[in-house]
Amino acid sequence: MEDLNFRKGDAKTDVFGSDRMLQPSPVEKIPDGPTTPEVAYQMVKDETFAQTQPRLNLATFVTTYMDEYATKLMNEAININYIDETEYPRIAVMNGKCINIVANLWNSPEKDTWKTGALAIGSSEACMLGGVAAWLRWRKKRQAQGKPFDKPNFVISTGFQVVWEKFAQLWQIEMREVPLTLEKTTLDPEEALKMCDENTICIVPIQGVTWTGLNDDVEALDKALDAYNAKTGYDIPIHVDAASGGFILPFLYPEKKWDFRLKWVLSISVSGHKFGLVYPGLGWVCWKGKEYLPEEMSFSVNYLGANITQVGLNFSRPAAQILGQYYQFIRLGFQGYKEVQYNSLQIAKYIHSEIAKMVPFVNYSEDVVNPLFIWYLKPEYAKSAKWTLYDLQDKLSQHGWMVPAYTLPSKLEDYVVMRVVVRQGFSCDMADMLLGDINNAIAELEKLEYPTPTRMAQEKNLPVEAKMFNHGGRRKTVKK
């Protein structure tokens, strides 16, 4: 047997000449002994080689580009736990400044020095906090009135992101869904009100629907809800899920009323790591005033050296994202954010217009209000096509593009769509490359003599396994 004892794999040995590189990476058990940092780094890095480049991932909403100074700041704070406010008091102050800035972007009426809000790991936790606050306010009022409080519900469109399903299950709150249709592509206020009753804790309109990219009309909902509450004597509030739109609307549509300018909007949540332009995970939630944040949501501990009060589902959380958000606010300012979001929107509109020119496709909506949109195969084209959008997804992935194909939610599940999310770091030149690859893929698919497996599955009404995460959640398989 060959003697390999001469190979110790120490720091002087070339990485690929080390004996550790002859062993597979650990799957079930921690290795018996240590290795050099160079080898460990290379092994972990090699595990990611088969992935797409993040900036070519048009499925994700998550920020995939920040400048070198932002990255440097965040790396320098990577070992700081935000919850240790006694040791890192300036981080806590910076967090408060970010909440102030976000709340004022949403036209907060609060006069206090520090606005009412909370840091979150992402928009999901922010949504949860907004929902829990609405539930606790409703429950407290019902208890004071001596009425039952065991059957709470909330109303939302079928375009909801998966966190709301989690919220309903975890807190045992009924989720009443208003169906989206081709005729009613956003939340219909009147249909939403039909689902309300004395047990409704809130209505949740969405700004930047994950599935479609559209915005619910919050102003119309607020107006209809005001009349409904006056008629019934209820005081059903609105929580706005602005995971994407919360950092788009203030800069591109400042005149549009969707925020705290509206009477019944009491809380708003947003993702900082989407169009807030910060690496994950970061989210924010703000309330119209302190009276709308129940005291029982604040928890205090003293084992960190002082009494620390926090609002959140998570306890420990990274401080680096706070620095990243505050840096972006200072670095870009209002005008800089406006320019970045404007460019993303214009590139999305450009791709939208080019997709409309392609024979097989039709866009779901005529306009693009956020930097994302969806399209599907024309029904007449799909009848004779030997391929599906799942096949186009696979073709594009061969060129590094991640463009998800998926079915729309309930009542629209017969429609398979594709979606593009344009983010900071995606240029017009990259858009042209994408469009070129789409055209080339279509040309190849149209040469097929026989139907693809996904096309045959569609014809037999069999489920097709979704191969790419679309950030909508809810389903592992789709019908068509």
What are these regions (language model features)?
Residues 1-100, 104-111, 132, 138, ...:
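Non-catalytic terminal extensions of PLP-dependent enzymes
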Residues 7-12, 118-299, 304-307, 320:
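Conserved PLP-enzyme active-site core in the AAT-like
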Residues 26, 82-87, 113-121, 270-273, ...:
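A short glycine/serine-rich beta->alpha loop
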Residues 74-81, 201, 205, 324-331, ...:
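A short small-residue
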Residues 90, 119-126, 156, 160, ...:
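Secondary-structure capping and boundary motifs in well-ordered enzyme cores
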Residues 95-103, 160-165, 188-196, 314-321, ...:
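Structured alpha-helical segments in the cores of large, soluble enzyme domains
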Residues 200, 204-205, 226, 230, ...:
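Hydrophobic alpha-helix feature that most strongly marks membrane-spanning transmembrane helices
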Residues 251-370, 376-381:
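Active-site C-terminal subdomain of aminotransferase-like
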